[in-house]
């Protein structure tokens, strides 16, 4: 996991069934159409998560041919286009997803993360806040984490901290929120709280170069030479070719 970037949530495969037909025949036809759409959406999402982008695109195109305005089909197609770095198409499909169902929290979340990634921070946070306000949405911790990361880019540390703390209130072991709270605390000169957050991070997640370098900086600020040396050794041993390992001598006054 790259904790320095926005976290894209697992794709929700719930397709909203909307409306009632005026006759049994039309109801049956609509139900058939929805089932076909849902099947292609689920297949497309599965292929996307496995990195099989071409096959995922084919399935999602079939879903959209069947139901062009389906919110979840457009949402997942938007994520696919984002992965393909076709940002214009991603934006178009995200807008269609929200037009199809403005209360789809998965679409609001993914679109908000996309906007933050593209530098549209205020608009991104607005969509993330809409997703976070849905009490039935199972990824509210991740939404708050993404909003916090987005606001750190602005930068707006006080508001970012509010979202990150909300994420930890929902999930006290959420690694990204722990890491970014450690970073926020360290950046504001609060090295002791930063130590607490980074220690909790290591208890709930695997080592990463970014987290180990931050831990080295924190212990350097706290003048704990033993802890600093221990984290530095882990960084050099586990990630010897990482940029973070190369930064040790400048980041915390350590020899190459």
Predicted region positions:
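Canonical tetratricopeptide repeat
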Residues: 42, 76-79, 110, 144-146, ...
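Structural marker of alpha-solenoid helical repeat scaffolds
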Residues: 32, 66, 99-101, 134-136, ...
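Bacterial Sec signal peptide processing site at the extreme N-terminus
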Residues: 17-36
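Terminal, low-structured helical/coil segments at or just beyond the last alpha-helical repeat
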Residues: 27-28, 34, 203-256
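Helix-start (N-cap) detector for alpha-helical repeat units in TPR-like alpha-solenoids
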Residues: 30, 36-38, 71-72, 105-106, ...
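Register position in tetratricopeptide repeats
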Residues: 49, 83-84, 117-118, 134, ...
């Amino acid at each position: 996991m790259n904790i320095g970037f926005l976290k894209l949530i697992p794709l929700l495969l719930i397709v909203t069934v909307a409306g009632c037909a005026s006759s049994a025949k039309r109801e049956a036809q609509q139900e058939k159409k929805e089932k076909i759409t849902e099947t292609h959406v689920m297949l497309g999402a599965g292929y996307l998560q496995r990195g099989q982008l071409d096959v995922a695109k084919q399935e999602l195109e079939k879903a959209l041919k069947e139901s062009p305005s389906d919110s979840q089909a457009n949402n997942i197609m938007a994520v696919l286009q984002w992965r393909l770095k076709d940002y214009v198409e991603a934006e178009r499909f995200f807008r269609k997803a929200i037009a199809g169902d403005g209360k789809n929290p998965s679409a609001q979340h993914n679109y908000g993360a996309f906007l933050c990634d593209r530098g549209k921070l205020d608009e991104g946070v607005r969509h993330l806040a809409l997703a976070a306000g849905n009490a039935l949405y199972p990824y509210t911790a991740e939404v708050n984490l993404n909003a916090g990361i987005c606001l750190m880019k602005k930068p707006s540390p006080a508001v970012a901290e509010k979202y990150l703390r909300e994420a930890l209130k929902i999930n006290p072991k959420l690694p990204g929120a722990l890491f970014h709270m450690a970073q926020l605390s360290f950046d504001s000169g609060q090295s002791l709280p930063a130590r607490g957050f980074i220690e909790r991070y290591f208890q709930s997640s695997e080592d990463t170069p970014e987290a180990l370098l931050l831990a080295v900086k924190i212990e350097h600020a706290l003048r704990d030479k033993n802890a600093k040396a221990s984290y530095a050794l882990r960084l050099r041993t586990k990630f010897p070719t990482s940029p973070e390992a190369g930064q040790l001598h400048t980041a915390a006054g350590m020899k190459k």
